Regions:
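Conserved catalytic-core motifs of GNAT/GCN5-like acyltransferases
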Residues: 179-180, 195-213
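Beta-strand-rich interaction surfaces with strong enrichment in secreted/lumenal proteins
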Residues: 1-3, 201-202
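Short, compact, well-ordered microdomains
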Residues: 2-37, 125, 138-140, 146, ...
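GNAT-family acyltransferases
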Residues: 41-142, 167, 207-219
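Conserved beta-strand-loop-alpha-helix junction that forms the acyl-donor binding cleft
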Residues: 178-188
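Conserved GNAT acetyl-CoA-binding A-motif
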Residues: 168-179
Length: 219
């Protein structure tokens, strides 16, 4: 469990219960971290826009990463941000992934985007793969995305997917494969809201999950 120490604490620990609550203890007493499940929900989502990350996004991106680690949540569509404690190394990897000449073996060229609200606050990330390999055709798709835990249920996922589809169209991708786990009802709803048509479900023996595979006509 991710800890958030403050000051020169003599003792630190965390508790996780049904409420997904995280605590730390320091010399000033017991403190309670935010419960992302009860974050303020907006009656209507702010408009968002996409842009590629740059050096000025260090603080926001790393804070985004910490939110996911704190609740042990998957960071889909982040180009493996969970594996990068070093922002500069992550940014360098994005540049390699975008250029077909430097894309690592076994991967496909892809572009990473930040989803930012009207105040330039980072609410999500989305990743557009420029083409499919066999694995992506079956389990991953052209697009992966995630919404910041504290910004969930604000309607951002539907906007993010729509905007990423526009980026795909700019690249000439007229038929977009997109996948989600069978149990992820919210993600399936987002895909259908953007024109997704379910083709079938595939069992992924590598992790024991059932994957729904959709196509979106993107002409």
């Amino acid at each position: 469990v991710k800890l958030y120490p403050e000051g020169d604490a003599s003792a630190r620990f965390s508790l996780r219960g049904a409420g997904v609550l995280y605590f730390y203890c320091n010399c000033h007493g017991l403190m309670k971290a935010p419960d992302f499940r009860t974050a303020t929900r907006r009656t209507s989502p702010q408009k968002i826009h996409l842009r590629e990350p740059d050096e000025g996004d260090r603080e926001q991106v790393m804070a985004y990463r910490e939110e996911f680690l704190a609740i042990n949540s998957r960071m889909d569509g982040t180009s493996a941000l969970d594996k990068y404690a070093d922002f500069d190394a992550w940014l360098a990897q994005l540049r390699k992934l975008k250029d077909p000449a430097t894309t690592p073996a076994g991967l496909v060229p892809a572009t990473e985007y930040l989803a930012l609200d009207e105040h330039e606050h980072l609410v999500g990330m989305t990743n557009l793969r420029h083409r499919l390999n066999d694995y992506l055709l079956t389990y991953g798709g052209h697009i992966g995305y995630s919404v910041r835990p504290s910004e969930r249920k604000n309607g951002y996922a539907t906007q993010m997917l729509r905007l990423t589809l526009e980026k795909a169209k700019e690249r000439g991708i007229e038929k977009v494969r997109i996948c989600c786990d069978h149990y992820n009802v919210a993600s399936a709803k987002t895909i259908r809201a953007n024109g997704g048509v379910l083709e079938d479900e595939q069992f992924d023996s590598s992790d024991g999950t059932l994957t729904q595979r959709y196509w979106i006509q993107n002409k």
